[in-house]
A protein has these predicted regions:
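Sec-dependent N-terminal signal peptides
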Residues: 4-13
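Short, solvent-exposed aromatic-acidic interface loops
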Residues: 100-104, 125-132, 157-164
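Short, solvent-exposed coil/turn segments at beta-strand boundaries
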Residues: 88-94, 114-120, 146-153
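Sec/Tat signal peptide C-region and signal peptidase I cleavage site
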Residues: 15-19
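Long terminal segments
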Residues: 20-78, 135-210
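Mid-chain, structured segments of secreted extracytoplasmic proteins
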Residues: 63-104, 108
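Mid-length scaffold segments of soluble, non-membrane domains
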Residues: 99-125
């Protein structure tokens, strides 16, 4: 019995160390990407990245009931090198995406970090009006989901009322609580849509890399 308990404890420790290492790697990649964008944020021609490393899409139109609506999306990419082939035009790989949009006066913001296989590895999202419990008033929420090969390894959820200045933690852990599964699934779907959009743009603007 003691041996089984020891093995289980060891497995739990190894699992925790693996998850922590995955989170740290994601944070390093995320910080490096944000530093790259910030280092070029003053350049009008690049607007946050070196020339040729992003697509910028904007849309503006009127929606029934909510009125004026705008979407502002950046898709950042890098060359995907293949040591087995020599190509003049290297294929591109989506690395990071940001999108800001509104419904009426409410402004939403999301960030997506992708791994080398094209899977979303990190999600940050700000939702200006959300409630998870029947007796809860609408609050402002921040979500951070860290993922390794599609599996959530860390979740951070913060919220604040419209009268509060700072967000406060309501959940932080290595699991994805059931009450936040729907929000997570919706954001993962958004990440997949942006990845598909990137591929469609590449087919039109960078087809000679094939």
């Amino acid at each position: 019995m003691k041996r089984i308990i020891t093995i289980l404890c060891l497995a739990a420790c190894l699992q925790g160390a693996w998850a922590q290492n995955a989170v740290e790697n994601i944070r390093q990649r995320y910080n490096a990407m944000k530093e790259l964008i910030a280092s070029h944020s003053g350049e009008a021609d690049t607007n946050g990245a070196d020339n040729g490393t992003f697509y910028h899409l904007t849309g503006t139109f009127n929606l029934p009931a909510t009125g004026f609506h705008t979407e502002d999306t950046y898709l950042y990419f890098e060359d995907e090198e293949d040591p087995t082939e020599e190509k003049i035009y290297l294929p591109h790989r989506l690395t990071f995406a940001t999108t800001r949009y509104n419904f009426a006066p409410r402004v939403y913001y999301e960030e997506y970090l992708y791994d080398a296989d094209g899977r979303v590895a990190f999600i940050y999202a700000y939702d200006p009006m959300m409630a998870f419990d029947d007796d809860e008033q609408d609050m402002q929420y921040e979500f951070r989901f860290y993922m390794e090969k599609g599996r959530v390894v860390k979740t951070i959820v913060r919220k604040k009322s419209y009268d509060e200045e700072a967000f406060r933690n309501v959940w932080q852990g290595n699991q994805l609580p059931k009450k936040y599964e729907r929000a997570h699934s919706s954001l993962v779907a958004n990440a997949a849509q942006l990845a598909t959009l990137f591929k469609d743009i590449e087919k039109r603007t960078y087809s000679y890399a094939e």
